[in-house]
């Protein structure tokens, strides 16, 4: 990238890529990334413990949270009402 310094057009490629300011900026960039990464993980954990709501008019201010799903029923599916299966073949009933 070209920039102007003291009335002269200079190319930034003439500077060393390993100058001290680049190294320190790179270090602080990585440090901020790590801090923000763990901060977002902890914020999600806090939201889960609080019932995922920051408003004071929530119904679940005591920390209980919303009610969970009902337990799954095991066994045959009875809620599909359809025709009965045909009788088994073989016997004529005589």
Swiss-Prot record:
It is a single-pass membrane protein. Keywords: Calcium, Calcium transport, Cell membrane, Endoplasmic reticulum, Ion transport, Membrane, Selenocysteine, Transmembrane, Transmembrane helix, Transport, Ubl conjugation. The keyword NAD does not apply. Residues 48-94 are annotated as: Disordered. The record marks 81-82 as: Cleavage. The keyword Transcription does not apply. Cleaved by CAPN2/m-calpain in resting macrophages but not in activated macrophages. Macrophage activation up-regulates expression of the calpain inhibitor CAST/calpastatin, resulting in inhibition of CAPN2 activity. This is Selenoprotein K.
